[in-house]
Every structure is written in structure tokens, then in C-alpha cells.
Amino acid sequence: MRQIVTGVIHQTTQSQQIPNVINSNQIQFSNEPMVVGSIEDFDIDSEVPPLAINLQRSINNNNNNNNNNNNNNNNNNNNNNNNNNNNTQPCTTVFLDRDSCVNVKATIDLLKEQLEFTIKDLIDFKENYDKLESTEQFKQWSNLIKNIKENSLNNSNIYLTIPTTQNLINNNNNNNNNNNNNNNNNNNNNNNNNNNVIIPSASTENKEENDNNNSNNNNNINLSPDSSITKDINITENKITEIKTTETKETSTGTSPLEKSPSKGFIISPKKPEEENEIEGETINNIAITNYTQGPSMLTLMKKKLENIKKNNNNNNNNGNGNNNSNNNNSNSNNNNNGISPSSSPPSHLNGNNNNNNSNNTNSNNTTNATTNSVGFSITMTNSNSLSVSKRMNKFKSWTSSKPTSSSIGFASSPQNNGKPLNISGSSRFFTSRQDSKIDLLKSPSSSPPTQSDIFNENNNNNNNNNNNNNNNNNNNNNNNNNNNNNNNNEELINNNNNNNNDENYKIEETEESLKELLEKEKLENEEREKILKERNEIDNLKKKNHLSKGYFMRACNASNDDGLEEEDIPLQDEHWETNVIVLLPCRHHVKVPGSSSSSIDSIRQLAWASGKMQGHLNLEKDEKFFTLRWCNKDVVFDQDTPLGHLIQYNLNYNNPTQKPTNIKLELVLEDELCKERLVDLQSLEINNGRPSIWKSHIDDVLSFNRKLRELAMLAKPQSNVPAARLTPYPPPKTIPEFFVIRVHLFKNQTKSLRCANNHTAFSLMTILSEKLKNTTPFDPTQYRFLITGINQYVDPNVPLLSVEYIVEKIKRKGEIDLTMVELLSLGLIIQQQQQQQQQQQQQQQQQQIENIDDENILKLNNGILNVLSKIEKPIREKDNCISSLTVTENLQVRLLHAHEIFASKASEIIGTDSPSIQLFIEAAVYFGGELLATQSSKLVSFQDTVVWNEWVNIPLAVSNIPNGARMCLGLNARYRGDIFNIGWVGHRLFDSKGILNTFAPFSLLLWPGKINPIGTCVDNLESKDQAIIIAFEFKDYVVPKTIHYEDDLIELISKDENGNELPVVTMEEMDRVEQIILQDPLYSLNKEERLLIWKSRYFCHTKPQALSKLLQSVEWTNYKQVGEAFQLLKIWPTLSAVDALELLDPKFADCVEIREYAVKCLDQMSDYELEIYMLQLVQAIKHDVFHNSVLSLFLIGRVWQNMQVLGHPFFWHLRADIDNQEVCERFRVLSSGFLRYAPTQLMESFKREITTLRILENLAKRVKEVPYEKRKQYVENNLREEQSFPTELFVPFDPSIRILNIIPEKCKSMDSAKVPLWVTFKNADPFAPPLQMIAKTGDDLRQDILTLQLLRLMDHMWKSQDLDLHMTIYRCIATGMGTGLIEVVPNSETAARIQAGAGGVSGAFKQTPIANWLKNHNQTENSYQKAVSKFTLSCAGYCVATYVLGIGDRHNDNIMVDIHGHLFHIDFGHFLGNFKTFAGFQREKAPFVLTPDFVYVIGGKDSPNFAFFVDICCKAFNIIRSNAHVFINMFELMLSTGIPELRSENDIVYLRDKFRLDLTDAEASEYFKKLIHESIGTLTTTINFAIHIMAHRKNLVSGNSAPKIGSASSLNLNKNKPSSQSKLDLSRSDLSRSDSSRSDSSRLDLSRSDKKNNKDNKEKEKEKEKEKEKENNDNNDKDNNNNSNNDTEKENSIDK
């Protein structure tokens, strides 16, 4: 890790020593102490430059400075300079990244040219100062300086440092005094001070001058001001004056480029700009390169030594030429040099040895302030002029969690800059830099536009550099003394002798041969260097163009108009208000555009763009569509459809409630460059419990997703208020009679019963009705429609009545059908309009050309949704700036930086100790679709709160072999006493949504607790309520400055490969083996040999469409040729059935976008009703998508918009149930918000009303738990009556076809189970329909119940498709949140426990007749009873098969119910997949499924023909399910990510595969199931469990507080429309499954106390009737039955005792 350690020197005295070496962990000081203002440890917000340069200068304490005897000087008085006892020689220390230490010489050239580029930038800044001084940014800088002066800003991310005015005055006065002594020929004693880097400059106006550079001030300018800055800093006036350099005498004809072009510096002084100070330029002599992580190496020392000797040799040769200067002066100076970072692109106009241009003996005493700024590098100017220039470098890295942050460029820019503006604010998501908390100024971007000439400045001086190298001999005569005395580097040795010349001459002779070898080597490297420079210059030229094309800088924005920032209040008291919106343009000018509360962000953007264009501000090559608006200073972005009213509301509620709302200030920025900003959605506040949705992932992914949604929304069909009734997809059952009766509700509460034939349509029935009423109430049958009573659906007049699902189900179950006649006008004209639009759409689809995929027989895009999804936006690649990942053959390398907050995350609790012997390590693994591709672990470090690795981990997987969609998982593990503990993990997608491998930014991610999950989420733990561990890492920069992207078109790439077109030869034996593999279930794992065989037979598999999943599992995803060929096969693969395509949504295929697209095209074959069945799994599959903007998400939303009535509610509530799940909350919020944004307004309002109602019921259910049991009913009634916010009309969440009105408080109560659910009753909107009852549950996870009920519904669908109707009663249940949900109440039903208890208490469980007698009581005629027995037989067969296959446990008689029509059904599915309950270590449930003797008795006995029919039905149903075993396995696999306790891994699904017995034929399976039937009947433990349960809950089962028996037949006939009995389906897992102590009333009716008295007589009468019937039955039974009855009585007595 690149740690930043900043040493800031304040008021350093002359006797103080300076630091000369900086390594990665500390500052090493010399012998003498120094005053350190502050030392900062590394910070995650610090952005570390890869190259830091430390320029050092010091003087020699040598008295002998007269070594040039050949010089014709008039007077040479060399005095001793005793400023500092430091013998450090002039040098430059470069702190270089290890990865950049490849070419030392290129780095030296890099440094030289970087300095000149900086000079040119500063000159340009000064020339444009008049223009910049009036800008808002410069004013902000002035305010920043004032804060520095007042010590109100801490040391962090400071970009500009200005010296004190008093020091500048003193310095200027001393310089003026020294300039008066220019004609003296004496060398003056100079008091040298700590100045900054000296910029070389010269002019040719004066030929003879004495150069005296005197500095008498001690000015230490700090790049990072600290609170310890001296208080005598006083800035009175900020004016910049130009400094002209002194002119040096030339004796040669040529001049260097530097001499031709004087450098200009900056000084802040109270003097007038016309006043000038003359200074003398100096150059840098020696350069040493140091690996900053390891200190100086031997190569460094040798290179430094050879450089010094080479320059001394050149100087000696110049001395022999006899070229003399008329004046020789020794100018001593102390330089305070700050760490700078040159760009990695070397300019071409600084070459050769241009460092010996001065004719002065310069002894330098260096005070080093090696301060590495957190943004870039900084250079401070000579003569106490300090200006920190921020630059963005090619290899620059800034901290982020998802992608690199934007950066801003301070007042200057250079062609080497990466071009991205740099934020002054250094804050990240997790850390806020200190200046952010001190001053609001730094929150705004600060980038000044450079001039066009600066950006496109061509370097035309390359050819003149070498010509100037030999023209400086005349200026080098007097430099020999300096070079001979100062060549010893401070890092190598310190000479305290006054005679350095002899030592240096000795070194020259000793290393002469080494120098020659070096020169020869340099000659050979010249060509290579020229190539490198040429390449870099080309890259620089591209970057220059990108500066403008990307919109970072403006092309000479000459417009002077600026609308200003005058604020005005927003009149929020008005419902519709208007205001002016201030928009900041990229050129930093402002425009004002009109807006209102309803104006969208997009409309403001368009107005701002038009206004900016009109005023001449926007001269960009980028189009308007590439820009978006960001909220100024808040890092917040809104979707383009967000109205301004929502923005103001968000500001008041969530940002600054106390601030008075004024003008809205937005900034026009490039959409692609948004990274730190948060995308806030404000249009679904009510849906998200009043909280805005804030996306923290890639904003471009979300914005792209919203754009696609807008296209899909245009295809949505208009929704009618009253949808058509659902048609049954199955043929009419054979059991339906030829004639049936329909009861029609007419006008004014009239009712008419009609006898209909099975071939009647709704219109023919309406015609018959009009004929019967023509004398009393005549009407036109064409102007009326039939509505299903109680359900908001109308019957299409042209369809047969038996094709309507509702009518068929009613005939089968009850035989009672209720319809309501309504006038067509009351339904509105929406129906007619809808029919007309449907006809138009059908005509357009017929005329539209259908796009084929390579073959007419392949899938056709016959849907507008798929046409939209097929428009894949391929990213635009700039070939010069991008490189394919297939060309990078290096291994994936990641640098593990550090991890912190380990203690706060309670990691020691996971380990079980906080022993110091614990060691931590990180496992870095690359996965694709859950398959491990490569892994590598880090070194072990000691356990502490903050752990630093700073280690490169080489993952043994080449970048070229990484598939698109691969993820890297980092797992933090602890080792203690040989055991490994998994502390946390996080997943990171290697290629982003644009296919870019982001290697140019460090990442900091929050860990999820536990072990690495290869198919888990790829977002970090942003929503953690506890402090999560933060881990930081970065990838290696492979091809800087180019970006690595995944190959966009692999198919085209492999098509060019001539060697890849050979077809493999497959033998017949291999084909047979392949067919056997294809028949294996989805849980079958292919071994290596089978994978190779499948891939070899890939074209044979093409003839077997079901082999697709096996083929995709056989692809070697690290081989791009195989991947490309697999994609090519997908293009021509036959279309799979929608059910088979579900397997392709498995997490093991989720990382491949192409597979996802093919699966979606197959799923589009489903009807809306089939899609509703699989909606739960499809929503769960979205969790595994690569990005939000996935084809599956768009497909589902598009299909939902096509049919809101059927799919809208299931889709929304499945999303909302998991919206608080931390791993997927962001994705599901994105989907739900996008879905509702473009959904019809009435649907949005409906969801709001439903959420409001549920919130009221949930809060009431929580409060009622604290109320005593006997007062709960009254408490519930009173609270519901007093509740004023209840919506008056809403749809039922689990069945939106039912519209309900107000709640009925007197019919609501709390149930007496542990979770205290609420029994609530609503009034139906249809006056002819009975009230609707449901159970509102809180504190229970209903997801397992929902999954089981869904699988039961799927089984019923499969059976009906095979013409097998088993009369399944599948009630509806929906989860509305975490631990909350609604359950449908099944009317006219009773639990088996209550029926048995009513037949004799505990002994009733051992009797055979209770259920049969109960059915006879409610079906008085023999015909109706036989119908009830038939329904009981079929439904019992269905549930026997279903409960056995699914392994449903906890099957006692209180979880089995029967309705009065004979339908048996199960409730409470808290245990499945073989998780049966145990007691004292023994399994209580021994039987394969529940089939007790009393059930068999109802069927007709074991020897009856009806029982044989029952057995045959069971076997048939079992074989039908077995033939679709892969569907159930796929559905369970898609549910692995839900977190259901009993469905964690594939091992749980193995139970399901075992129960299917796929190894048997249908005949063998039938025999196998027959054995299970007889085994279940003969298992006595089932009956004993029933008896024990009755005994445990006897009080509730027989008490008056519980539900009564169903009324007599006469009472049922009197109240046909009203249910005589209701049952409570309380599916609490903890109540019914885990607790046997508190289940008193979970599945029964609970009468109020007022009903006890009325029901007492009825109970006694019913008991007498039951006794009489039992007597008759006992008389008619044989001896065995009598014996059984006696045994039952004995068992009852023993149990009672």
C-alpha cells in the first residue's frame, strides 16, 4: 500500500537538519533534530501519486574554492559560507513505484520535461490572471487562504499555499539591495534560506553582469497548511507580480531553449505589478532514483555515482578549453524543495544535458519538505513564491467502492493530464476528509478552463535540444569548483574535509572504464527511448483531443455573460409554484432557466442546454444526451422524470429541514463521469415507507435501466377498469353435468335463477334473460354485461360459459354460480376502446416484418418487448485508448492494502477469543457461475483492529482467460490453533456494465459476514446496521494509460480463426453415452471426462434441445474460443419450452448475459397465467443477475405492464417482500421504483392504499400483544373504529380481482396463537357478495408456506393438463414484508382435530366414523353425500402424493381440514423436504404420508372399489409428477437464495430427487407407491399423534370459546349466500410447527362471548344427533367394527386417566 506520511516543516532554523530519505512508513531524519509541524498517517481518502520527487540542495563548508587557475578573474574572493553544517551535495531523490523502476533514464527525462511543462503551465496561468481573477473560483481560493491564515482549516488536500506578506516584503527589499552590488567582483557571504524549486531562466539583453542571488528570509511554505502554522502570517493584499530573471553572459553563438524563452514566476506582494525583481535561475544537476517502498538500492547508489562522475568529467574537459567568463560569482542559496510527481508522459522538448547553463559557482544547502499531496504533485516557486499546482496523472488512483472518483484540475493543466476534473473534496462514502467538515467551499468542484493554446500546445523544440548541449562550455569553467566539491550525495556519504577535489579526481580515474561502458549502453538505448517517446507523444496528442471531446474543458469559452447566483425564495405555500433554476455549465458560467413545481429534471436540462448554446457557453463536441444534472455541492443525482417539487421536498425532509428554500442550483455534468454521486428516487416515497430510494451502485447502470423502461412503457397496453374474466386453460371436466343453474342479480336487488346448458355463451344467456324480463323490465342485451359476483371481472359475451375458470370451479366445488348484470355504460368506454386498440395492434403485428435469428425455425421475435430488449447498446470503444483483455497474458494481480473496523464488527465473537495468537489472512478467489476458476491467499498477519498487508497477490489466472461476468470474492479468515474461522467476504465484478476492467482505481468495500458465497451479491454491505469490516485493494495497471475491455464480439473474432472451423468426429458409442447424460436430472454433476465428451459432441447435442444445460456446463469458460463457439450455438439453438428454460436461470448460468437472453426468449412463450405461477422463482432469479439493467428484469416489467390485472400485484409484492433484504434491497428498490414510475397512476394509488392498510393492521397486531386476552377483542374493535386513515376502497393484495370497501370492526378480533394475528373482515364492493375475511400476520416468515403453496398449485396445473382434476383446495398467501403477510380464509371448513374431538374427545382420534358422520350432517341427501365422498377421495389422493414428494412434516390433525363439500386440504407448511419433528430424539412421524383409518372409512374401506380407484389415482398422479421432476428441482434451485431455513443448499434438494424415484419405470413406481399407501394405513403412530394433539389442546377444542360445529342442514339452506362456518388458517411456523403449547385457535373459528349462549343449545342438539347416528352405524357394522369401537373406548379411558 502506498502510505502517505507528510512531514511539514514550520519555522525551521538554520541549525536544524533536514530529512533526506522518505520510505513508505516513516520519515528518516539526519543527526540534527528538526521541528515537524504535523505527520499524517495514511488515509483512505488520500490519493497517492505513483511518483514523488524530492529536490535537495545544500552548501559545502569548503574554504578552498579557487581551483580554476586558468580563469582570468580580476578579483576572486571566495568566502566561507557557514549557514548549515551540511555537506550534502546537490541531488534529486525520486521516490518511485516499484512497477515503474524499469527504465531509469526514461524517468530522468520524465522529470526534466515535467518541470518545464509545469513552468509553461504557470506562465499561462499568469498571462490569463486578469481573466481568472474575476472568476468565482479565484474568489473561493481567496476565501480558502483566509481560512488557512486563521487556522480554521486542518492539514488535508490543500492545493494552494501563499507566503506571508511580511516575508515577501523583507525578501524583496533584500533582493533590491543585492541588485545594487552587481558590478562588484567579490563573492558575498550569503545568508541562505529555505526557498523552493528554482526555475531556470535566462535572457540575452545584458552581456556582462554580476549575479548575486541573496535571500535573507527564512520562508518555509507548506503544501498542507496545519493548525500549527505561525500566527504572524498576514496577507494584506493578493497581487501577482512578474519576476524577470537576470541575464547571463553568453560566449557561444547558440542558446538553449530555456535561454530563448524566459520563465516567469509568481509572487504575492503588496507592491505594484510593474515592480520587478531580478533573480537568477539554477538547474538540477544530479538525479537519484529510490524505490520508496524499500529505500535506496545498490543500483540506485551506483547509478547516482556514475552520473556524478560523468558530469565532473564533462566539466574537466570544458576547463581545458580555456573559455573564461569576465565575472565569476558564487551565489549561495538554500532551497526548500517540495515533493512533486511528474506525469508519466515525457515531453519531447527537454533532452540532453541542459543542466549546466549557469556560469556561477552554486553551493546549495537544501531543506527538504517531501510532502506528498493527496491529490497530485506540487511545485513552489523561488524567492518565497509558493504555488501548489495540482495535476491529474495517467496512473492516478482515487478511492472508491465501485469505480474511480472524478478529480478536478486546479488553475493549470498539461497535455499529460488524464483529463478528468478533480474534486477538491476528498471525502468518500466511508470517510470524510477533514476540510469537508470545516468549510463548505471545498465541496464544489474547482477547475479553471485552460486556454486552447495550452491544451493543443505542440512541442516543436525537439530538434533543437541536442544542438544546445555543446554551446554551454563557456559557462562551465567556474562550475568545476562546485561540482568537484559537491558531488557526494547526502544519501551515500558526507565529507567533512575541505578538500573534495582530490577525492573526486581519484574516483574519476577509478571508474573511467565503467563510465565508458555506460555511455556505450546509453547509445544503444537511444533508439528505444526515441520509440517510447514517440509513442507517448502520440498518446498525449490523443489525450489533448479527449480533453475537449469528453467535455472536461471548454474550447475558449469567450462568452462574458453570467446570470449570477442571486437567490430568491421559493413560494412553497402555493400548491403550484414557479422559480428560477440556476444551472452551472461545464465552463463554470451560470445560466438561469424558468421552472415550476411540476417541471422535470429533463426539461430543466434541455432549457439550460439551449440557454448555454444561445449565450455561446457550450462549445463541446459531446451531444446534449450525454449530459445530466447534478445537485450542486450535494453529490446527488435525480432521474430525468423527477419533478422539482420532489427535489425541494427531499431537501426539506432529508437534507436541511431548517434552511429556507431558495433557488434550486444544479450542475450540468457528463453522465459517464458520475461516480461518487448518489441517485435519489423520490417518486415512490409512500411505497418505501416514506424514505427515498438511494442507489449507491453504478449510476450509469441505473440510468440506462430507466431509459429502457421508458421504451417498454410506450408498448404497454391501456388497462381497463374492469378486466375480462380469466379463461380456463384446461378442457371442461367430464364430471360437469349437462345442465346447471346460474343465479343472476338484477336491478334493485332482484335475483333471477336460470337453467343453462353447457354450450351457452354469456350473450345467449343475456338474450334468454331479456326474453324473460321483456314484460316487466325490458332491456337491450347488447348494452349489458355479466360481472362475476364479488369479483371485479366481466364475462366476455362471445365466449362459452364453461370456458370461464370461475364458472367451472364453482360448478365443480359447490354447484352455485352467482353473476351480476351491469350496464355497459357503467363500465365506461374503456372496454370498447381496448377492443379497438387490440384489433389495431393485431393488424400492425401482421404487417410488421418479424426478425429471424439465422433460421426460420428458430425463435422469432414476435413481441414488441423482445424487440426492445434485442436493441443491445454496445459500448463505443476508442481504439487508441482501449485494449482487449484477450491480449493481456499476465496473471490477475491484486494488491491487498488493508482492512479495518475488525474489532467493531465483533470478529472476536466469531472466533471465540481475542487471543493475540490469532492470525488473519485474505483469500482471493475468482468465480464464474459459482465455479472456482482460481484462488490465492495472502500472508498471515496478526489480529488487530486495522491490518495492513500492502501485498501483491498473484492469482494464477491470466487476464485473457477471465470470462465476462466473472467475479472476484475476497474472504477475510482467521486462523487460531489450526482452525479456520470465516469472518467476512465481499464479491466484486471484474468487468463492469460496459465491459471495462477497472484497474485504475483502488476499491474499498464493506464485508458481508460469513463464508464466501460464489453466487451471492456483488455489492458490498452498504445497508449493514452494524459496523462492517472495510477492506481496501487495487488491481495492477497493465497497459496504462489504456483501459482493458472484454471483447465485444467473440463470435466475429472466432469466425476469423481458420483453424477453429474443424468439426469433431463423434462415434455411435459416444452418442449413446451423451444421450444417457442428457437424461440425468439437473442435480447431476458432470465429471471432467463427461464434460469433454459433451463438448466434443456439441453439434450432436444441437439435435437434442434439452441438452443445452449440460452443454453449457461443459464449456471451458476460461477459453475464449470455446465461449465464442458456445454463443454461436446459442444463436442457432432450437427453442426450448418455457418450463425447461427455467434451468437456464439457475445461478450457475447467471453470470453469462448471452445465456440469460436466450432463456428470456424462451420464457416469452408463457401465457400470463403461467407466468404468474412461476413469478416467485423469476423474481428470485433477478437476484443473481449481473447488473440491474438485465434482460430478465426488463422482460418481467414489460410483461407485467402488458397485463397489470394478472401480473401487477404478484410482481410488486414479491419485490416488496424482499425489499428490506440487505443483499438485494438496492436492486429490488430500483426495480420497484422503475416499475411504478411508468405504471398507470391508478395502480400506484392502489398500492399506496394497500400499504397504508397493512401498516395500520401490523401496528395494531403489535400493540394487541400487550393487552390481556379477555380484553383483546374489545381493544381491536375500538382501535379500528377510531382509526381515521383507513382507505375506503382497495384491492386485496393476494387477489386484486376482489375489490373491498371499509373494514367491519365488530367482525374483527385477535387470535390466541403466540404471534397474535388479526382476524379481519372487510365489506365487499359488490353488494351481492359476502364479506371477505383474511388473517393479517406479523412476526412470522411466510416464504416457506408461499413456496409450498406455489408448488401445490403447480402440481394441480400439471394434473389438470393431463385431464386429472384432484379438487385441490389451495388457499392464497402472500408476504408483504419481512415477517408480515396475509392469509386467505377458506370458508365452510373445519379441522380434523375438532371433528374428531367432537366425536368423543381423545377417543375420537381412534374412531373411524367422525369425518364421515360430519360430512353426512352437511350433505343430507345420498346424492350430495356421494359427491362429497368423491371429492374427498380425489383431494385426499392429491395431498397424499404432494405431501410425500415435498416431504412436508408436522402433519397432525390440526393441520388437516375438510370443508362441507368434502374437499380435504392441508395447512401450515412450516417443515418440508423431510424435516420431520422429533420427540426425545425419536421421529414422531413414521408414516410416508397421512392416511388414517377414518380417512379410508370415508373413501369406502380398504376392500371397496372406491379405494381401488383411490389407489389408481394416487399412482397416476405420482407418475405425472415424476415426469416433471426437473421442473420442481429447478424451482427449488432458484429458491436457494431466499434464505429459507430448510432450503440452504443443493443437499436439501437431494431429498426431493430421492422421493421421485427416477430410477424406476412408471409401472415400478406405481407398485412402489401402492406399498407406501398400505404402509401409511398401518402406521399406528399417526393415530396416536392425533390423540396426543387432541389431549394437549382439549380445552380449546371442546371449550365454548372455540369455533362451533357447522350448523344443521336447515340452517345452511336458509343462509346459502353466507358462510355458516369459517376456518382460521393460521400458518405461523412458530405457532403450529415449533410450539405445542400455544396453538389453541390457529385453524378454527372463534366466536365472541355474546354468541356462546346462542350456540349452547345447538351444540347439545348436534351431540344428540351424532350419538343417534353413531348408534345406527354401530348396529349396521360387523363384529370387527364393534371390536374397534370397544378398543377406542378403552384407549380413551386410559388416556384420560
Curated annotation (Swiss-Prot):
Domain of life: Eukaryota
Domain (PI3K/PI4K catalytic): residue spans on this chain: 1304-1581
InterPro entries: ARM-type_fold, C2_domain_sf, Kinase-like_dom_sf, PI3/4_kinase_cat_dom, PI3/4_kinase_cat_sf, PI3/4_kinase_CS, PI3K-type_C2_dom, PI3K_accessory_dom
Comp. bias intervals (Basic and acidic residues): 1626-1681, 1688-1697
Main enzyme class: transferase
GO cellular component term, pick one: cytoplasm
Family: Belongs to the PI3/PI4-kinase family.
Protein name stated in the entry: Phosphatidylinositol 3-kinase 3
